[in-house]
């Protein structure tokens, strides 16, 4: 296990989870807007 300094593990998980949710929401929004424009 590598010690990344004084950054707590919950903060890393929170930032990672927020990034995943943002990417997924952008993908869903892009596919939804693309589907609407194609129709």
Curated annotation (Swiss-Prot):
GO terms for biological process: photosynthesis. It is found in: Plastid, Chloroplast thylakoid membrane. It holds the Pfam family PsbJ. Signal peptide: none annotated. It is a single-pass membrane protein. The chain crosses the membrane at residues 9-29. Keywords: Chloroplast, Membrane, Photosynthesis, Photosystem II, Plastid, Reaction center, Thylakoid, Transmembrane, Transmembrane helix. Its main location: plastid. Gene3D superfamilies: 6.10.250.2070. InterPro entries: PSII_PsbJ, PSII_PsbJ_sf. The keyword Cell membrane does not apply. GO terms for cellular component: chloroplast thylakoid membrane; photosystem II; photosystem II reaction center. Coiled coil: none annotated. PSII is composed of 1 copy each of membrane proteins PsbA, PsbB, PsbC, PsbD, PsbE, PsbF, PsbH, PsbI, PsbJ, PsbK, PsbL, PsbM, PsbT, PsbX, PsbY, PsbZ, Psb30/Ycf12, at least 3 peripheral proteins of the oxygen-evolving complex and a large number of cofactors. It forms dimeric complexes. One of the components of the core complex of photosystem II (PSII). PSII is a light-driven water:plastoquinone oxidoreductase that uses light energy to abstract electrons from H(2)O, generating O(2) and a proton gradient subsequently used for ATP formation. It consists of a core antenna complex that captures photons, and an electron transfer chain that converts photonic excitation into a charge separation. Belongs to the PsbJ family. This is Photosystem II reaction center protein J. It comes from Thalassiosira pseudonana (Marine diatom). The lineage of its organism: Eukaryota, Sar, Stramenopiles, Ochrophyta, Bacillariophyta. The gene is psbJ.
């Amino acid at each position: 296990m590598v010690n990344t300094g004084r950054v707590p593990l919950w903060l890393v998980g929170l930032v990672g989870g927020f990034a995943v949710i943002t990417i997924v929401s952008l993908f869903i929004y892009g596919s939804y807007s693309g589907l609407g424009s194609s129709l």
